[in-house]
A protein has these predicted regions:
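Ligand-site clamp/hinge motif
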Residues: 206-253, 381-383
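Gly/Pro-rich hinge or "lid" segments in bacterial periplasmic/extracellular proteins
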Residues: 64-67, 158-215, 219-221, 227-229, ...
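Surface-exposed binding/hinge segments that line
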Residues: 22, 92, 126-170, 192-194
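Periplasmic binding protein-like
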Residues: 31, 102, 376-403
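N-terminal lobe/hinge region of extracytoplasmic solute-binding protein
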Residues: 32-84, 115, 181-183
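Aromatic- and charge-enriched surface segment that lines or borders ligand/interaction sites
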Residues: 78-123, 137, 143, 234, ...
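A structural "hinge/loop" feature
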Residues: 35-51, 76, 103, 149, ...
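Append "and occasionally in soluble cytosolic enzymes with long acidic Gly/Pro-rich linkers
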Residues: 203, 263, 283-373, 377-378, ...
Length: 403
């Protein structure tokens, strides 16, 4: 049975692939994605890498988001304690766990990973900013000393920057790291990568959980297919088992297929745009406020997402643990947006905006067109720049980009 997963909360999206022949024999699970991996280092990967890496690597703890209590469950750590002041955390590590390269997982490996990740100033390295020291107390005991209280149990469960990987990485060339050869402990191992085409993972025979169940796959193929129509056809024809980012408008068509299941889950994802605060004209706070006031979230949810989302009440999704709504969210109001333009001190001719968006998503395209229309109504000149996620991700990290 093929699966289509919809994330009800202005979903971002994941992946699926196509093009060459697929040996769909029951032992191969085929996923379709809209773009490729850009960083194979588990220390700094911060984008679509999460799909293959969540099968290749594991954290110390997992956060169970299936219920409202958001329980922490054991990963590579079996138990943990913290001091009353929240500054000292002790983790008991799982025994008899090996990395894909044969290295033994232990406290020294944890220390190596955290120390290495902290040394970078990119990706999710910031999650370790409150960790002052990591001590390997014993083979399977590790202590984290913080400089101020932080929810370290949540931090070590992060989907970015918290994967445990082999200390043998220190002896690897940068080229080997860049090609996906850093070993993890996960159920699947890296096998091959054809850039912009396919990633293949194979079963880890030494996986610590074992493979006693009969319902598993020998191979995972993650294929890159930029066109949503092609991803849809792959699901319909049985060439793909799992797909994300199928346009909402086509879901009813898929629901009629006996071999396809369409499921909906609340997501910890908000749909938002990044504004460059270092470059004209979005370095002007009143221009930024005008853009925010011209963003019609209700209309976008209703007509673009078919009410599959909820209007966000802040930058962070409201269903994340300990969420508190900020009081600074600007409501949609075109008249107020025009007033912000006047307060900016700039004429309409001085305000030219480029909007980059992911062209492989029909929802992103329609959202951007809605924004384009509203910006025109308040006198802002806008140029649309569609492109692949990987290209837009690089733009988002470039100070020269405006939006």
């Amino acid at each position: 049975m093929a699966w289509i997963k919809r994330l009800a909360f202005f979903s971002l999206a994941l992946y699926i692939s196509c093009t060459s022949e697929i040996n769909n024999n029951g032992d191969v699970f085929v996923v379709a994605t809209y773009d490729d991996v850009t960083d194979w280092d588990p220390a700094t990967a911060y984008s679509l890498e999460v799909l293959p890496m969540s099968n290749m690597y594991e954290p110390l703890l997992w956060l169970d988001a299936s219920g409202d209590d958001h329980k922490m469950i054991p990963g590579l750590a079996t138990d943990y304690t913290k001091s009353e002041d929240g500054l000292i955390w002790k983790f008991e590590l799982r025994k008899n766990v090996y990395f894909h390269d044969g290295e033994y997982f232990n406290a020294n490996a944890v220390k190596y990973v955290v120390d290495r990740n902290k040394s970078f100033y990119r990706g999710a390295s910031y999650i370790w900013s409150n960790v002052k020291e990591v001590r390997a107390d014993s083979e399977h005991g590790v202590t984290f000393i913080l400089d101020k209280p932080a929810p370290l149990d949540r931090i070590v469960s992060s989907q970015y920057g918290a994967w445990m990987y082999s200390p043998a990485t220190k002896n690897m060339s940068s080229d080997s790291i860049a090609k996906g050869h850093v070993a993890g402990t996960g159920p699947y191992m890296f096998n091959s990568w054809q850039r912009n085409h396919q990633i293949e993972l194979v079963r880890n025979n030494r996986y610590w959980r074992g493979w006693e169940q009969s319902h598993y796959f020998e191979t995972i193929q993650i294929r890159v297919v930029s066109e949503s129509s092609t991803r849809l056809q792959m699901i319909e024809s049985g060439l793909a088992d799992y797909a994300v980012l199928i346009p909402n408008q086509l879901l009813d068509r898929l629901k009629t297929l006996d071999d396809v299941r369409v499921s909906f889950f609340p997501a910890w994802i908000n749909h938002f745009y990044l504004l460059n605060t270092k470059k004209h004209p979005t370095d002007n706070i009143f221009v930024r406020r005008a853009l925010a006031a011209a963003f019609d979230r209700k209309k976008i949810n209703q007509y673009v997402y078919g009410d599959l989302g909820r209007e966000p009440t802040g930058l962070i999704p409201s269903n994340t643990p300990l969420f508190i709504a900020p009081d600074s969210l600007i409501n949609f109001d075109l008249e107020k947006a025009k007033k912000y333009i006047k307060q900016s001190g700039l004429s309409n001719k001085e305000i030219n905006i480029d909007i980059s968006y992911v062209s492989t998503s029909e929802e992103y395209r329609l959202t951007t067109l809605t924004m384009f229309d509203n910006f025109r109504k308040i006198g802002i000149n806008t140029k649309l720049k569609p492109g692949l996620w990987s290209a837009n991700w690089e733009k988002a990290k470039d100070r020269k980009s405006v939006v």
